[in-house]
């Protein structure tokens, strides 16, 4: 008899330990867990306590033992026109060789290894090699600016950095080594070694005694067996930095066992992936989707994972569909921004290739608007499934799960990412009182009750206090995990995400702290004060707009344009091009309350052409009038 999804979800909360004990059987354990969940020290939670396992074993070795010739990793680069296919046996050989290199450099369980690489197979080998030996990897998005990279080096204190000479995007080469060398010179912590993969794209200087050549060490260590190190389930597996509202980066810390179990269940129940099939996520390993659904998730499920270096429109706007046809992709994961880019091109390109293998397209990273969802669903003629989650959660928090045996499928609803997934105790709360909002269409903060399910963050790396205060201390009188997103829920239980409650904006799926951008801009000698807000953009979801008060008003329009260019260049250099505001407007004052608090939401509303609402606390009405005039020039 089929049960409703609501009943299934309720059981995952009411019979938590029994529910997750069943899911734990999806992976291999060297020693079985002694306790499913230790929630005795809220808000912390420990999953599968006492069990020992290994992410690399579950992703690679166990499949190599039974299906050595099956495809595991498919790498395609339209940037350098190369394709490589690795079987599970070949992938294990590459991972063991890299693990041997790390061990030879003195890397031990618990040591940190920072990975600053483009979308190349060696990046996946590096992550899996760290997992194999119990080192904690910290992947930083390739091409990240030196100042940002330096702050992550100081926070993670890696013994070793793995990098490459260059990445490439839309035909433009981005040299990584100068950025990395500058970051290390800026950082207080100095890694002992830098392991360099030389792609032959950009010449670089080697630092004697520090820099190591990957090809040379690979040849030296090839064929050297390195067994998996069995790790207690709650051992940290990796840290991944996410934007916060303050300048210091937040390292989301993930465990080993809970993460493996959560991914195994999600690959089956949410994505419907099957061993032997091909999964294609267009994300990057620098983001959480790349960790969960390029590297670990598909491989744990025994699928081939397609790793793509390139854009959705190079060499043409049919490139993704060509790959779906060639590699018989069954499940695809992308972002609404990528679809909006494709939407600018002829819809006939969607029909050019045989897409009969494709069962579903999942989209996440930013809100999915209805026109975009309809366009791609009509073009592909497969289900398009929105899903909402965060770096912190590690796997989808809201979506629709269509592959749970004996449980009725919840239909998709345009505009909503879906319903709470199993294991997540999701609530909407009043931000001022902490009261639970049970009625339909009430706006509240989207939160989760303790304990978070397996796969979610354990803590903030090296800063338990920040974990408790930031995530669990923002709602009055309630110790709940805040997503910092506004949401409503309709009468059928579908959640609708309304936007951020804090000052993080979402540009094409990249989460950026507005205050981080403000700090960068205010460091320019010509700028007295600045406010950055995220405004809706039809292509990127949101873009950053900066409103700066200059120390001296630019004398001419040309001078203003030159100063705007300098500010943008500064952001590029310190934070990376992804953080660059689309415009910098110069104003004589910013809209503030009489107590000096910046009226950020009013500024954002005016920038988006909306009613700014109650302005009774506004000190000087000319501030917003000035902004309106500038925007409508």
Place the predicted regions along the sequence by residue.
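AMP-binding/adenylate-forming catalytic core of the ANL superfamily
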Residues: 140-166, 180, 325, 332, ...
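Gly/Ser/Thr-rich phosphate-binding loop
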Residues: 296, 303, 330-334, 343-412, ...
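Structural core segment of the AMP-binding/adenylate-forming
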Residues: 128, 132-216, 335-336
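Conserved beta-loop-beta connector loops within the AMP-binding
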Residues: 423, 427-450, 491-492, 555-564, ...
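Conserved pre-ATP/AMP-binding loop-to-beta segment of ANL
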Residues: 69-71, 194-197, 201, 205-241, ...
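Conserved ATP/PPi-binding loop(s) of AMP-dependent carboxylate-activating enzymes
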Residues: 419-423, 434-472, 512, 611-612
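Conserved ANL (AMP-binding/adenylate-forming) active-site segment centered on the GW(Y/F)…HTG consensus within
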Residues: 410-414, 454-484, 501-502, 514, ...
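Conserved AMP-binding/adenylation subdomain of ANL enzymes
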Residues: 260-278, 288-330, 344-347
